[in-house]
UniProtKB/Swiss-Prot annotation:
SUPFAM superfamilies: S-adenosylmethionine synthetase. Homotetramer; dimer of dimers. Belongs to the AdoMet synthase family. Pfam families: S-AdoMet_synt_C, S-AdoMet_synt_M, S-AdoMet_synt_N. InterPro entries: ADOMET_SYNTHASE_CS, S-AdoMet_synt_C, S-AdoMet_synt_central, S-AdoMet_synt_N, S-AdoMet_synthetase, S-AdoMet_synthetase_sfam. Its cofactor is Mg(2+); K(+). This is S-adenosylmethionine synthase. GO terms for biological process: one-carbon metabolic process; S-adenosylmethionine biosynthetic process. It catalyses: L-methionine + ATP + H2O = S-adenosyl-L-methionine + phosphate + diphosphate. The gene is metK. Residues 99-109 are annotated as: Flexible loop. It comes from Haemophilus influenzae (strain PittEE). NCBIfam families: metK. Transmembrane segments: none annotated.
Length: 384
């Protein structure tokens, strides 16, 4: 019997890098509401007392960058100086330019179907049947811990919580099946006055226990709650934050490969984002169809070229049919050209700020989580 441990981490919406992601995606959403053809690459940097929003944007839309940035920061919970960051009073700097005309000529086409990829690159998508949302379990539960932290903070149930937090979940596997939680790490920013006893008890009873399956917990499970003992200074006062610095948190928690391209602040013409969503969509439909227990898709593109330069399917020995057949089915049922996948997944809509915390995958409200091709794939593969 083979046994091993696997760990994934998540961070809260108040983590500095996630503040930056949410600002960048909020800018993207506001632009897409006004200009569906906009080209957006928005980057954000946050540090004590300031937020810098920059990048390359070509659009007919007008967005009040300053007020939008302040709103995002305040919505997260940084509303007064005792938090170490205040959306009402921080400086907001704007350093936005236009997209290069050299890129435009390679992307835009008279026939939209011929739209070229906005850049070269490789993208991966992944799915596994170890959770109901067809995502790896460690990252799924790490995200849920962070969502619960935000819920009890914002509701006032644990009023001493502050926005910055991190989680980490280590699962124990035997013969590739989860048999329990080996360790949980949860570090959360808090107010000055809360005692360590109250903090430990509150986090355990209101965050950890309601989220993790009771059958996975045992007397051997290790819990590390604020292991340094104090976490008052947090958010951008503790660390600077940058868009695109949490690409593993955003995807599969290290359970699958990553092409290296970040998502937030990029419009769907950027295949770093849209093709990674499409790859997840393809992998999830293959697993939902019962064609594999685990599936990883790799796509690659050349700048200015519509068709993917490669498609790879890997099922890690769990496939019910040959990988070569799966590749041909992917080509048959999924249009993976940039314009095709944008239409297939209805990506020109203001949905991106919501993706920028708690993971881009495994959340059913997003169109790339549909399994509407699962039955077609199953029939075409000849499975009963």
């Amino acid at each position: 019997m083979s046994s091993y441990l696997f760990t994934s981490e998540s961070v809260s919406e108040g983590h500095p890098d996630k503040i930056a992601d949410q600002i960048s995606d909020a800018v993207l959403d506001e632009i897409l509401k006004q200009d569906p053809k906009a080209r957006v690459a928005c980057e954000t940097y946050v540090k004590t007392g300031m937020a810098l929003v920059g990048g390359e944007i070509t659009t007919s839309a007008w967005v009040d960058i300053e007020n939008l940035t302040r709103k995002v920061i305040c919505d997260i919970g940084y509303e007064h100086s005792e938090m170490g960051f205040d959306g009402h009073s921080c400086a907001v700097l704007n350093a936005i330019g236009k997209q290069s005309a050299d890129i435009n000529q390679g992307v835009d086409r008279e026939n939209p179907l011929d739209q070229g990829a906005g850049d070269q690159g490789i993208m991966f998508g992944y799915a596994t049947n170890e959770t109901d949302v067809l995502m790896p379990a460690a990252i799924t539960y790490a995200h849920r811990l962070m969502e619960k932290q935000a819920e009890v903070r914002k509701s006032g149930k644990l009023a001493w919580l502050r926005p910055d937090a991190k989680s980490q979940v280590t699962l124990k596997y035997e013969d590739n099946k989860i048999v329990g939680v080996d360790a949980v790490v949860l570090s959360t920013q808090h107010s000055e006055e809360v005692s360590q006893k109250d903090l430990h008890e509150g986090v355990m009873e209101e965050i950890i226990k309601p989220v993790l399956p009771t059958e996975w917990l045992s007397k051997e499970t290790k819990f590390f709650i604020n292991p340094t003992g104090r976490f008052v200074i947090g958010g951008p006062m503790g660390d600077c934050g940058l868009t695109g610095r949490k690409i593993i948190v955003d995807t599969y928690g290290g359970a699958a490969r990553h092409g290296g391209g970040a998502f937030s602040g990029k419009d769907p013409s950027k295949v770093d984002r849209s093709a990674a969503y499409a790859a997840r969509y393809v992998a999830k439909n293959i697993v939902a169809a019962g064609l594999a227990d685990r599936c990883e898709i790799q796509l690659s593109y050349a700048i200015g070229v519509a068709d993917p330069t490669s498609i790879m399917v890997e099922t890690f020995g769990t496939g019910k049919v040959a990988n070569e057949l799966l590749v041909s089915l992917v080509r048959e049922f999924f249009d993976l050209r940039p314009y095709g996948l944008i239409k297939m997944l209805d990506l020109i809509q203001p949905i991106y700020r919501e993706t920028a915390a708690y993971g881009h995958f495994g959340r059913e409200q997003f169109p790339w989580e549909k399994v509407d091709h699962a039955e077609d794939l199953r029939i075409a593969a000849g499975l009963k």
